[in-house]
Amino acid sequence: MPDRIEEFLEAGLIAHIAYVENGEPRTIPFFYHYEAGHIYVHGSAGAGTLRILEDGRQVAVSVALLDDLVASKTASHHTANYRSVVVFGRCHRISNLAKKRRILDATTERYFPGRHTPQDYAPATDDDLTRMELVAIEIEEAQAKARSGGPMGPNDDEENAPGTAFVAPA
């Protein structure tokens, strides 16, 4: 996996998972954990959300990070600085409790750095993990796209041109 793709996946916060159900396109946002060519998502075994991600289902996953808003002196040249990844892969259910525990702990550390069991929260019990679905999406193909830099409109460098051009952190 190219470093840039891994960097973007490790930095992202929300993954939008797209799939086709009964001939209709669908997408669902998830917190996720990326590790070694796999995107992991978890949720309640009783909820229907993860049931649709059955073993072998093909999915597309999109992760995007907005870094800056880029204003131009020309309306059609307003843009953004961003990093994004689209991956294609297949879903696999994880039933091993030790792996579920490890991925759940890694996901918690990713979104809540510095929180640890037992001082900050109770660890997941085997019963908790049994009631939790964990799906691994094995990445088969991935593409990254990014933009960085300042305004690039036709008059953005001209001091006397009307309007303002700037970069605002998101």
Would you name each region that the model predicts?
Residues 32, 89-91, 139:
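A structural signal for short, well-ordered beta-strand segments
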Residues 45-106:
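Short, structured beta-strand-loop surface elements
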Residues 38, 58, 90, 141-143:
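Structural motif
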Residues 1-16:
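Short, basic/aromatic recognition patches
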Residues 16-21, 49, 74, 91-96, ...:
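Short helix-to-loop capping/linker segments positioned immediately adjacent to catalytic or ligand/cofactor-binding
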